[in-house]
Amino acid sequence: MIPGEILTGDDPVEINAGRPVRTVLVRNMGDRPVQVGSHYHFAAANPALDFDRASAWGHRLAVPAGTAVRFEPGVEREIELVPLAGARVVPGLRPESAGPLDAASGTRIADTATIEDISGFQGEGS
């Protein structure tokens, strides 16, 4: 065995098995490529990305850990998102969206002014 080596079985490993998946249409409105990592809170991604941020609140990309998705300028594509798990608290990242993803009352923070107040989020559907 090599230090750090991971030995797996012969069968493929299914990622996000049994997790609810939602599809979101994303367009890069900027003039530079944007890359988003696997476990980044997608609703707080680069403001140049135009998509339904309220729908993406509390979700991450449905891709293997350690990978990323690149959005080229002017290109529109569908992506799949899965809910962030664990304690559902996002520290850091964008300060406007940091903290618990779910309000104590059971309502989502995205349903309050918090999501609209994130600087750089512009216009309908962004």
Curated annotation (Swiss-Prot):
Pfam families: Urease_beta (PF00699). The keyword Cytoplasm applies. Gene3D superfamilies: Urease, beta subunit. GO terms for molecular function: urease activity. The keyword Cytoplasm applies. Pathway: Nitrogen metabolism; urea degradation; CO(2) and NH(3) from urea (urease route): step 1/1. It is found in: Cytoplasm. This is Urease subunit beta. The gene is ureB.
